[in-house]
């Protein structure tokens, strides 16, 4: 689900990057970089964008020594802001583009969600079609009515399970989703071509 949440965190920047200018722009740039590198958190999901900068507190004046033993002044500012987020949850209905087809399932990408796995066991009435290498058609899943799930096809699916993976130092955290087409006649391929990045 999509949300707009208020968040607070400390943003650290090197004093030499200020060059006598207002700290607001460097702080905002650093905050954006941190969110891009972190990508997602367990509580709120994927960070989609900062919608408002609420406040920037006073510098906490931390000093550290760098590797060359020259003292580098690190300024740390408490920042409050609102952020648009996307948290996938069991039962959500999403749509995304098929990126890879294997004999036992397909990987779907939906906006920032790169790893939605749709198992053949969760595709009622579909069967795997392995095309010979000499043919132009790629491997895909197909029903008796000839509807296909193949690379590039946009698929509507329901979230069956969600797993959050937090990486060391919170760099490029990610969500992994199990998808299903069971339980609703509207689930399945909705077009043969579509946006690689559905509107978020």
Swiss-Prot record:
The keyword Nucleotide-binding does not apply. GO terms for biological process: DNA-templated transcription initiation. It is found in: Nucleus. Keywords: DNA-directed RNA polymerase, Nucleus, Transcription. The keyword Nucleus applies. Coiled coil: none annotated. It comes from the Eukaryota. Gene3D superfamilies: Nucleic acid-binding proteins, RNA polymerase Rpb7-like, N-terminal domain. GO terms for cellular component: DNA-directed RNA polymerase complex; nucleus. One of its GO terms (molecular function) is nucleic acid binding. PANTHER family: DNA-DIRECTED RNA POLYMERASE II, III, DNA-DIRECTED RNA POLYMERASE SUBUNIT 7-LIKE PROTEIN. Belongs to the eukaryotic RPB7/RPC8 RNA polymerase subunit family. This is DNA-directed RNA polymerase subunit 7-like protein. It comes from Arabidopsis thaliana.
């Amino acid at each position: 689900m999509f949300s707009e949440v208020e968040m607070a965190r400390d943003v650290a920047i090197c004093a030499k990057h200020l060059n006598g200018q207002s700290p607001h722009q460097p702080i905002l740039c650093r905050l954006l970089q941190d969110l891009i590198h972190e990508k997602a958190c367990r509580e709120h999901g994927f960070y989609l964008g900062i919608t408002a900068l609420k406040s920037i507190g006073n510098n906490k004046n931390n000093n550290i020594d760098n590797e060359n033993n020259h003292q580098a002044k690190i300024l740390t500012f408490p920042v409050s802001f609102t952020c648009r987020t996307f948290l996938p949850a069991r039962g959500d209905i999403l749509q995304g583009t098929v990126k890879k087809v294997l004999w036992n399932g397909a990987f779907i990408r939906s906006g920032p969600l790169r790893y939605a796995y749709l198992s053949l066991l969760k595709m009622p009435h579909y069967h795997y079609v392995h095309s010979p290498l000499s043919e132009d058609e790629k491997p895909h899943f197909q029903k008796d009515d000839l509807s296909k799930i193949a690379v590039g096809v946009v698929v509507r699916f329901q979230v069956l399970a969600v797993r959050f993976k937090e990486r060391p130092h919170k760099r490029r955290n990610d969500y992994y989703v199990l998808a299903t087409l069971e339980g609703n006649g509207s689930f399945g391929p909705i077009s043969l071509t579509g946006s690689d990045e559905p509107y978020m």
